[in-house]
């Protein structure tokens, strides 16, 4: 399994129609910020990208990136713990 970072322009999505929170609930995940999630999946970055893209406006930014250890970050304890537990080592 790999861990993917999904980050998108949360401000350009209608909160009532934001697909990302519903999509990530299908995976082991952690929310890192309003528009960023890490998910654990066997799916490819492009597959996840194409699942989300149709719901975003044309000018919204979307990135899906593979994550690995080591990493550096400043977040809540449960976010850091989740990343240390789930991220594979480089």
Which residues are covered by each model-predicted region?
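Short, flexible beta-strand-to-coil junctions
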Residues: 9-13, 67-69
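Alpha-helical structural elements
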Residues: 3, 22, 32, 58, ...
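Short, intrinsically disordered low-complexity segments
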Residues: 28-72
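Short, flexible N-terminal segments of the mature chain
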Residues: 14-36
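Short glycine-/aliphatic-rich beta-strand segments at the starts of folded cytosolic domains
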Residues: 1-10
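Short, low-order "capping/linker" segments at domain edges
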Residues: 47-51, 74-90
